[in-house]
């Protein structure tokens, strides 16, 4: 006969069976154990106050609760267990079937799962008396330290492990193995809880704003505990713990912090505490927004190697070799006439510690980098963003931008020793690639070109010809004008494999197979006034996935493009009522997949008239016109020099001048009261060979409609190689020949 489990402090009754004095409440918590059996926890009370709350929802202080494989089966499983104290349990709530899966081996502390199960079975068959004694012991209530609260359970005890000197129970499930903290408020969690109470100011019922986000006190406590210990405690757990501390009334200093917040002796202490609070929680909030936390790293010296993590660890598979391409060693500087004592304009800050940033779904980055949204369907292509902060001081006389400018960067790739043929076919340091570069001004394309023979692990210059012109042109501008010029410039570079199979010349010479694109480099710039701020920060961007469009209907789409006009920045805009779409527009459909650019050609891009644009795009166009107006401060001098170098083109110039006079009144320069700049005509083919408004038919059966091809050109290349001309235009400012090779 099993002994009856009786609470340690049963109220005394008189001879008539009545209690002496007022009846005291008896609180019983009911829970389901990990083996599906019911557990009861009895809380006796005095003076209408519960003495202590349960420390865990599954009553883990009853040593450990494990899977059925660890249990010592009862002699008669079909018999309904009888609780002499609390009555009879329903058989339907017992012996619930659980899947024993992924059982964890506890090493020296715990025996092997199979051996443990076999030993228990033999013990059941060979030692029934000892088993009965164990069951009787299990029916005895397990008490807390104060002896007032007991746990009554039918479940046998499994082996117990330890983590950071705290008992840990293993709970096998069908999905994964996990470690369960038997003490929710362990010493490290309690220490972090008390620390954060001394940081958070008391704000009554109002929430605290951190970086524009309203947070409650319990949420801040939860975030701090997770950042400090790596153990997550919910807001409800924090709230319950606060109520327990108040009810117990033992830690008066903590209760005072809960009720009144931290108290300061002087105003300086309050300011220092406020600053510390903002620093700590600003960092926690930033890490929480970016989706990572440095505090989640476990202490390797205190955690045995055989202990599992709280969840099954998802190992990062390095299956994509393109992710191993690193951008490094970037700098821009100006040397003196002897090639010594360089003045550093900017230098890379975090070449070895590049963090990833996932963009939100509503991020409008395509306004700065047209065509970037096409890469949303290509998550395997790495996108590296460089924020370049440039210092441009007043240079001494011995320094010259034209002679002393220097820039360099490298694309590093370490090929593994045992690389598979598939790995080598994707990326290899021994292969040469092509680099497509497109420069934008406030989202409008101004120049683009291709480079061949690009090799990895080699230092190369960063378009020095463009920067020499940029610094020499805008170096004398005001602080605001120079800052606006830097802010408006963005550069997109696409590294792709220039093999015969990469470009579909038989279908369209402007399309490149997406599988041949290896890397995308994005550049943004800003002007700084301090040398310590002249740093370049590198970040790996993760684009939000593109919503898949329905392909049930096959429709024919026609796109049309136009050549830039000779006498106006605005060019000849396409008719807004036409069903055709300008390929120079950045808002192309998913089937078009257009990236502005041109292979083996360099030309200027046209900007539509502001009157033909929707109201939402007009402010950006005004900024573009202001930026281009600054570029035309010296057009007459450069035009006179080019006319002296090109006397043979005088006849063609006169014919263009008459046409320019007719369009000068409608030019955007009239809005700013500026004279119409003279146009260089070296880049343009005579009118007899020019083609305007050329269109082609693009349907869903075209090879580019399956999103496997990417557009590298939005201009017609059927009238010859433009790079053979003597001049070309950059934002409607002409350059002499030889400048092309510098890019």
Curated annotation (Swiss-Prot):
UniProt xrefs under Pfam families: TEA
GO annotation (BP), single: positive regulation of filamentous growth of a population of unicellular organisms
Disruption outcome: Impairs the formation of germ tubes and true hyphae; and decreases virulence in a mouse model of systemic candidiasis. Leads to defective biofilm under normoxic conditions but not under hypoxic conditions.
Keyword Transmembrane helix: no
Ranges annotated as biased composition (Polar residues): 1-11
Highest taxon above the source species: Eukaryota
Subcellular location: Nucleus
DNA-binding region(s) in UniProt: 178-252
Entry similarity comment: Belongs to the TEC1 family.
Reported function: Transcription factor which regulates genes involved in hyphal development, cell adhesion, biofilm development, and virulence. Plays a role in the formation of 'finger' morphology, a unique multicellular morphology of C.albicans induced by carbon dioxide. Regulates gene expression during intestinal colonization. Required for the expression of the secreted aspartyl proteinases SAP4, SAP5, and SAP6; but also of BCR1, PGA4, and CDC24.
PANTHER family referenced in this protein's UniProt entry, alphabetically: PROTEIN SCALLOPED, TRANSCRIPTIONAL ENHANCER FACTOR TEF RELATED
Name of the protein in question: Transcription activator TEC1
Organism: Candida albicans (strain SC5314 / ATCC MYA-2876)
Organism taxonomic ancestry: Eukaryota, Fungi, Dikarya, Ascomycota, Saccharomycotina
Name of the gene this protein is made from: TEC1
């Amino acid at each position: 006969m099993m002994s009856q489990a009786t609470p340690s402090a049963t109220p005394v009754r008189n001879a008539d069976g009545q209690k002496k004095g007022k009846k005291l409440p008896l609180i019983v918590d009911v829970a389901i154990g990990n083996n599906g059996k019911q557990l009861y926890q009895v809380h006796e009370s005095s003076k209408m106050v519960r003495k202590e709350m349960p420390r865990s929802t599954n009553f883990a202080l009853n040593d450990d609760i494990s899977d059925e494989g660890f249990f010592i089966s009862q002699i008669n499983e079909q018999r309904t267990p009888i609780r002499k104290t609390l009555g009879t349990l329903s058989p339907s709530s017992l012996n619930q079937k659980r899947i024993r899966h992924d059982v964890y081996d506890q090493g020296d502390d715990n025996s092997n799962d199979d051996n443990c199960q076999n030993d228990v079975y033999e013990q059941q068959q060979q030692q029934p008396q000892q088993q009965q004694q164990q069951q009787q012991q299990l029916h005895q209530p397990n008490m807390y330290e104060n002896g007032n609260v007991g746990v009554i359970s039918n479940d046998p005890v499994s082996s117990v492990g330890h983590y950071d000197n705290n008992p840990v129970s293993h709970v096998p499930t069908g999905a994964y193995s996990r470690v369960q903290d038997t003490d929710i408020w362990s010493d490290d969690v309690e220490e972090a809880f008390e620390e954060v109470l001394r940081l958070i100011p008391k704000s009554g019922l109002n929430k605290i704003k951190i970086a524009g986000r309203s947070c409650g006190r319990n949420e801040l406590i939860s975030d701090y505990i997770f950042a400090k210990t790596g153990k997550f405690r919910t807001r409800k757990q924090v709230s319950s713990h606060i109520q327990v501390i108040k009810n117990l009334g033992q830690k008066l200093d903590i209760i005072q912090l809960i009720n009144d917040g931290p108290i300061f002796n002087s105003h300086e202490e309050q300011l220092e505490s406020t600053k510390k609070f903002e620093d700590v929680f600003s960092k926690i909030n930033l890490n929480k927004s970016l989706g990572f936390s440095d505090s989640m790293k476990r202490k390797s010296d205190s955690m045995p190697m055989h202990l599992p993590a709280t969840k099954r660890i998802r190992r990062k598979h390095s299956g994509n070799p393109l992710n191993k391409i690193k951008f490094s060693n970037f700098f821009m500087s100006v040397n003196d006439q002897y090639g010594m004592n360089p003045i550093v304009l900017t230098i890379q800050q975090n070449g070895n510690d590049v963090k990833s940033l996932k963009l939100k779904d509503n991020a409008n980055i395509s306004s700065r980098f047209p065509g970037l949204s096409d890469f949303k369907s290509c998550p395997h292509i790495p996108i590296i963003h460089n924020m370049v902060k440039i210092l441009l001081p007043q240079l001494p006389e011995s320094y010259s931008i034209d002679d002393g400018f220097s820039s360099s960067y490298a694309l590093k790739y370490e090929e593994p020793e045992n690389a598979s043929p598939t790995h080598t076919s994707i990326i290899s340091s021994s292969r040469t690639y092509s680099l497509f570069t497109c420069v934008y001004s406030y989202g409008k394309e101004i120049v683009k070109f291709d480079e061949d023979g690009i090799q990895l692990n080699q230092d190369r210059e960063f378009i020095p010809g463009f920067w020499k012109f940029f610094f020499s042109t805008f170096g004398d501008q005001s602080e605001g004008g120079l800052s606006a010029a830097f802010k408006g410039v963005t550069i997109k570079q696409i590294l792709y494999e220039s093999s015969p199979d990469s470009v579909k010349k038989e279908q369209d010479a402007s399309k490149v197979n997406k599988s041949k694109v290896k890397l995308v480099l994005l550049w943004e710039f800003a002007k700084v006034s301090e040398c310590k701020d002249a740093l370049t920060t590198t970040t790996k961007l993760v684009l939000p996935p593109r919503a898949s469009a329905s392909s049930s209907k096959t429709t024919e789409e026609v796109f049309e493009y136009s050549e830039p006009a000779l006498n106006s920045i605005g060019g000849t805009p396409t008719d807004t009522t036409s069903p055709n779409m300008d390929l120079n527009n950045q808002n192309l459909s998913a089937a078009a997949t257009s990236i502005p650019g041109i292979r083996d050609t360099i030309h200027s891009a046209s900007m539509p008239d502001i009157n033909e644009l929707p109201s939402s795009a007009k402010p950006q166009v005004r900024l573009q016109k202001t930026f281009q107006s600054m570029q035309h401060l010296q057009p007459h001098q450069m035009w006179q020099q080019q006319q002296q170098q090109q006397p043979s083109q005088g006849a063609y110039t006169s014919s263009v001048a008459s046409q320019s006079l007719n369009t000068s009144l409608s030019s955007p320069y009239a809005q700013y009261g500026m004279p119409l700049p003279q146009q260089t005509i070296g880049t343009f083919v005579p009118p007899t060979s020019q083609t305007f408004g050329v269109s082609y038919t693009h349907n869903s059966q075209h090879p580019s409609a399956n999103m496997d091809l990417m557009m590298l050109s939005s201009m017609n290349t059927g009238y010859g190689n433009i790079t053979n001309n003597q001049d070309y235009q950059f934002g409607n400012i002409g350059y002499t020949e030889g400048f092309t090779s510098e890019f």
